[in-house]
Amino acid sequence: MAKFRRRTCIILSLFIVFIFSLMMGLKMLWPNAASFGPPFGLDLLPELRPPNTHLENKADFQRSDRIDMETNTKDLKGAGVTVHPPRASEVNLEELPPLNYFVHAFYYSWYGNPQFDGKYVHWNHPVLEHWDPRIAKNYPQGRHSPPDDIGSSFYPELGSYSSRDPSVIETHMKQMRSASIGVLALSWYPPDASDENGEATDYLVPTILDKAHKYNLKVTFHIEPYSNRDDQNMHQNVKYIIDKYGNHPAFYRYKTRMGHSLPMFYIYDSYITKPKTWANLLTPSGSQSVRGSPYDGLFIALLVEEKHKYDILQSGFDGIYTYFATNGFTYGSSHQNWNKLKSFCEKNNMIFIPSVGPGYIDTSIRPWNTQNTRNRINGKYYEVGLSAALQTQPSLISITSFNEWHEGTQIEKAVPKRTANTVYLDYRPHKPSLYLEITRKWSEKYSKERMTYALDQQLPAS
């Protein structure tokens, strides 16, 4: 038995010496400059590490904002990194593409998280019930539970961010600048007012204006349907906006063919208010008229149904926009009707602003609304819409949206994410910046084409 143990030990020792010698020999044969790098070639996956994005080590974001970058490699399942907004740094505008001030993007500042707001805001959006109880009973109820469960079918590269975070605002401005978007149309409620799922956001406007100005962007206002909106309080709110923000260099003014430089206001759900009430504000003889006053502007109505165009004309609006990103959902959002709407606007001296979106999916908050989902088809849906818009030779184009995550219309960067209960949609096989890049391409194309037919080539006034 002792001889057997001794023999075993000798054999084992010789085997270890052999393995050690083999490894040393291989090491000597391997080139000194060789490097294995990240396992599985992760350096070849652009989705995992967007270019020019700096990751800070300090725990600025909640642990919950960790984004799981899923790959189809089993060993990497569940791998995650915490993504922070890039640090504010000196901006070299020469390295960024030229702006197109005739391209506007709808922007939302209603998001919040515990770090900046003490709680999640909008990311925890409730699941909305269908109006028919017989249908509603077939779908889940309750609220989303961030950070892993948010009210969106996509997941932001910045995580469940706060719109109050200055670094987030700066990142958004840089993304829009990279897409050649010249103007952001800021969703706006009066001070101390908000949508039913949000908080007041007017106090953010100064920061948004400052950050926009840093990148030479302009800011216009997308006035939401706040409670009891009418001619009187609209007059007060227009006055408030112009008095408080009108002197900021980032405040947007549109130079008309007549040479007037006027603020622009998009009016969401304008059809809710009767034409007679709008006429009080928007016609020269109206009791609350802004016409010819320091608070005059270009007021753009939302057209949903075809009949709305006559109400819009009677109301005294200066133009129409179509907002919705779902082709075929409404008369206004249907591409096939845009040439007719453009002709109507031209005949009545109004501005036509078609709205184009990259897709639509709101089933995270309206699970019963699958019929209005529009697949992105790797950017093809977006490009078809942009092409249709350019064919009308519009004065302006609006993008729905930069960051309306609930309805899946965002062009902001999104990343892959998978949880135990949810697999979020993403932009693969392309990079998170896909829709910014598409926007830039078409913005540049639009800028060149517009020079051949438009009479108002001036830049917006500062």
UniProtKB/Swiss-Prot annotation:
Any GO molecular function: alpha-mannosidase activity
EC number: 3.2.1.130
Sequence ranges on the Cytoplasmic membrane side: 1-9
Name used for this protein in its record: Glycoprotein endo-alpha-1,2-mannosidase
Main location: Golgi
Pfam family, one: Glyco_hydro_99
Localization per Swiss-Prot or TrEMBL: Golgi apparatus membrane
Organ and tissue specificity: Highly expressed in the liver and kidney.
Native species: Rattus norvegicus
